[in-house]
């Protein structure tokens, strides 16, 4: 007789959960023992914090939802969010999905819950439990800056299942029109008042901490994720993310940090597309001139 059990995940479950993710089309973490840095190296993790829950059928893991503690600040108070990760259930056991996610919602340690990487399948479950999307109309809209038009168009057509030969032909025909856009990028206004320092996460200085203190002091009524140097190092200086070569573009004026932009590689092996993604961007007072200069420094 089949025995279904939901229990708190253990660090020893990492390999089995990784296998679960892979057989359900989720990449999972690139490095071994990724759970160590996700939780044990996390400043806001405690032994009382559940790292997630697993769904077992006869002692075989067939479902999982992770639970990462992330710090936010609002009205001068620190809030610890339970951030869901890798919510996945084998197809034949998805009738237990609500029971699994209910364990996540019943935890007592988190002040709020965040689902930052929901796909179409998991988002339908989140909606059933009344989770709300963030109040920003374009939060799920992707913007592209095309560097190699031929490769980009070819990859896009292949993703749409257009035959290889036809994709190649169309990409060469359309590429010149896209390249024209590249020629007019310099229409962005230039500014000599800013400097940009390019660094790896470990090279960050305490100027980032000064910037963070200014931002949170000037925005007490905004719900902000922690962006001090330690938080950035935790997120970007680990074996898993190092494979994506994170770089930080720090916007400086008179030797004072006014903002930063973090980029990582997210190449698509399946479609042969090389991609660099803006993973984080913040500037003092959300100044449009600073934002434009930061983006321009990266793109150009």
Model-derived regions: residue spans:
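Acyltransferase donor/substrate-recognition loop-hinge adjacent to the catalytic core
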Residues: 1-4, 12, 132-222
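Generic intrinsically disordered, low-complexity segments enriched for polar/acidic and small residues
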Residues: 32, 61, 90, 101, ...
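A conserved beta-strand-loop-helix scaffold within acyl/acetyltransferase catalytic domains
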Residues: 4-87, 196-283
